[in-house]
Regions:
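Active-site phosphate-binding/coordination module
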Residues: 42-133
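Active-site loop/short helix in cyclic nucleotide turnover domains
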Residues: 35-36
């Protein structure tokens, strides 16, 4: 059996067991097209509807993003979806954003580096985005 055929067989089997299956997807570049600046990003309505429908079927549906978790929620806007932000450093749980404990020791240094990048690069036209536990 080819790798591709084996992968399709596994996917088919998982689709037949929705009560134990999670569907996880990246947001930017997968659900939302890549755009010049983050504020221009948008998840098409038909994909939001698709996420809503599959969230009713599968055990877990999650959106994963390099954005802040709140920004990922704003892009999709569905309470039934679990949101992981900042490349997995954050999770939206019960309406609250939690930063994973392993990331907390680095928070102060990330903020220092973000400030330094903004100070040195913004005057040259670079866009520096503060995202809490990360920066871009």
């Amino acid at each position: 059996m080819t790798d591709r055929k084996a992968a399709w067989e596994r996917l088919r089997a998982w689709s037949e067991e929705p009560g134990v299956t999670a569907v996880l997807t990246d947001i930017d570049g997968t659900l939302a097209p890549i755009v010049p600046t983050p504020d221009m990003s948008e998840v098409p309505a038909e994909l939001k509807e698709w996420l809503r429908r599959i969230s009713e079927r599968y055990l877990l549906v999650a959106g994963i993003s390099g954005r802040k978790t709140e920004d990922a929620l704003d892009l999709i806007g569905l309470d039934a979806v679990v949101y992981f932000g900042n490349h997995g450093f954050e999770i939206l749980r019960d309406g609250e954003v939690e930063v994973i404990p392993e990331a907390l020791p680095y928070l102060e240094r990330v903020q220092e580096l973000e400030g330094l990048a903004r100070e040195r690069l913004a005057p040259q036209g670079a866009f520096v985005e503060e995202k809490g536990i990360t920066a871009s």
